[in-house]
């Protein structure tokens, strides 16, 4: 099965039973290997708004992992300033061809709801989260309200 066929099938399956934390899941009109979605985290401070995502699949998928990038800015120790996510399930070291995109999205949702300061890409935010969680929550809330996308009803 080619990457395009597998990705199209996974997209179709996900759209049939879209998890409650996702909205507006679609591929680019002329490229099924690039998806866009809206992530709706459940926990504060991220549950105040939604966040746009872009998921890009390489032509070698499923033998190479997809990349996940936030296109909405987010104050999070596991997301760099460019929106790239440190998500172990899609690291080259941990990737398995049997992993499905729904599992990647579930892991991403869990990571957003529960930041992992032990695997940061933004060390200063991980330190803030562990040393002053109240300040981290306040900053993350302000950032979320400023840059987040209104949640669909």
Swiss-Prot record:
Pathway assignment reads: Protein modification; protein ubiquitination
* InterPro entries associated with the record: Ub_conjugating_enzyme (IPR050113), UBQ-conjugat_E2_core (IPR000608), UBQ-conjugating_AS (IPR023313), UBQ-conjugating_enzyme/RWD (IPR016135)
Which keywords appear in this protein's UniProt record, sorted alphabetically?
Answer: ATP-binding, Nucleotide-binding, Transferase, Ubl conjugation, Ubl conjugation pathway
**Domain of life per record:** Eukaryota
Which reactions fall under this protein's catalytic activity? S-ubiquitinyl-[E1 ubiquitin-activating enzyme]-L-cysteine + [E2 ubiquitin-conjugating enzyme]-L-cysteine = [E1 ubiquitin-activating enzyme]-L-cysteine + S-ubiquitinyl-[E2 ubiquitin-conjugating enzyme]-L-cysteine
Q: Which SMART domains match?
A: UBCc (SM00212)
Pfam families under this entry? UQ_con (PF00179)
Q: Signal among the record's keywords?
A: no
Q: Which SUPFAM superfamilies match?
A: UBC-like
PROSITE patterns in UniProt: UBC_1 (PS00183), UBC_2 (PS50127)
Establish whether keyword Glycoprotein is in the entry: no
Q: Post-translational modification, briefly? A: ISGylated.
EC number(s) on file:
2.3.2.23
Q: Which GO terms describe its biological process?
A: ISG15-protein conjugation; protein polyubiquitination; ubiquitin-dependent protein catabolic process
What's its job? Catalyzes the covalent attachment of ubiquitin to other proteins. Functions in the E6/E6-AP-induced ubiquitination of p53/TP53. Promotes ubiquitination and subsequent proteasomal degradation of FLT3.
Q: What is this protein called?
A: Ubiquitin/ISG15-conjugating enzyme E2 L6
**The organism of origin for this protein:** Bos taurus (Bovine)
